[in-house]
Amino acid sequence: MKKIVLLIYLFFILNCVSFAHDYSKDNVNVDHPIIKVVKPSSKVGAGYMKIINKSNKEIKLSSLEANIAKTQEIHEVILENDVYKMRPIKTEILIKPEETLEFKPKSYHFMFFNFNKEFEDNEMLEAKLIFDKGLVIPIKFKVVMGNNEYHH
């Protein structure tokens, strides 16, 4: 009986660990990175996550490196004359100490154009977030299919 309970416990713990996809380095946490695509053959997708700066220093997000699509960019959405406009970011994004930067719809997000292949729901895709001062955080985006709204 003890062996069965132990096996169930280990199975539960290992599954929880395998489904979690949060990343941390040098007091910077990356929470739940996902790429939303409408269908497997989509050519465009958006990436969302939270970046939490738990350090006592400012950090700047410079770029994203990935072999996911032909082009990947950091974008922001601004409201101009009652119209939302999306545009690529040309500079680094500052994250102050003890602050969180959330990549979400109608805000900062990653855009992926011309994916290198078709994806499956829940597929994990490797990438690297590049910050100033040489900080690089390897992450994995989880592919989320469908038209439903993003919920973190």
Task: Walk through the language-model features, giving the residues of each.
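Bacterial N-terminal signal peptides
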Residues: 7-15
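Positively charged n-region of N-terminal signal peptides that target proteins for export
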Residues: 1-4
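Compact, glycine-rich, soluble single-domain proteins
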Residues: 21-152
